């Protein structure tokens, strides 16, 4: 389960982003974007995040996951579409050469501190 490793990295990065001048910081939310091609299971990541945040300033924080679809552009005709299945062929001209425009993201967008 690679979600635990990802959760631990999120905790490390988000924890490091908390300004040092704040006394007893507490994080309310961590907002992330996860592409479909990362093979991250959102429920598993949330479960692992809740474990990884114990005894940290992120304990009890909500993990908000925005799933990013796989978007491709055909190299032959330039058509762009959202890929929903295993077929990466262009839905317009059926060419097999595509550029992946999105779907590989795994980004921390923001953290929100409790007041």
Curated annotation (Swiss-Prot):
One of its GO terms (molecular function) is zinc ion binding. PROSITE patterns: HYPA (PS01249). Zn(2+) binds at residues 74, 77, 90, 93. It comes from the Bacteria. Coiled coil: none annotated. Gene3D superfamilies: 3.30.2320.80. This is Hydrogenase maturation factor HypA.
